[in-house]
């Protein structure tokens, strides 16, 4: 309603376009943050249930969303208090590079993540999570 009063139908179209882009971006990031990881239903969310990265540019531009594992550990912390976690699964690149691959080259992203998923299974997954994967 506000968009229409401010800019007419053009404002409404812009509002809808921005909303669609924002939703696509949010879901792409969510997909990337949890890609291929499993958790036993009802078990607590832990550090190893999301991908982490400590790339400086991504951290600055995306308000530390790169410290996603710490957010899983302590969801109520403000973004500026999120710290890198050494014992969390690590993305091969920063969020911005990885997101570009997810959106435009999904087959390349999957191939790039295969060794990371094997490492996760061998070093982070619980026995129950390994059984879910098998």
Mark where each language-model region is.
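Hydrophobic, membrane-inserted alpha-helices
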Residues: 1-3
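Transmembrane helix interruption/hinge and helix-loop junction motifs
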Residues: 5-13
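Cytosolic/stromal cytosol-facing helical appendages immediately following the last transmembrane segment
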Residues: 15, 21-134
């Amino acid at each position: 309603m506000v968009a229409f009063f401010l800019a007419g139908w053009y404002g409404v179209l812009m509002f809808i376009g921005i909303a669609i882009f924002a939703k696509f971006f949010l879901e792409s990031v969510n997909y990337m943050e949890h890609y291929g990881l499993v958790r036993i239903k009802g078990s607590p969310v832990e550090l190893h249930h999301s991908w982490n990265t400590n790339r400086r540019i991504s951290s600055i531009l995306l308000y530390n969303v790169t410290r996603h594992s710490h957010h899983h550990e302590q969801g109520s912390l403000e973004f500026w208090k999120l710290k890198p976690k050494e014992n969390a699964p690590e993305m091969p690149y920063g969020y911005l590079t990885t997101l570009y691959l997810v959106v435009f080259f999904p087959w390349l992203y999957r191939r790039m993540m295969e060794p990371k998923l094997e490492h996760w299974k061998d070093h982070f997954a619980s026995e129950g999570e390994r059984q879910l994967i098998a």
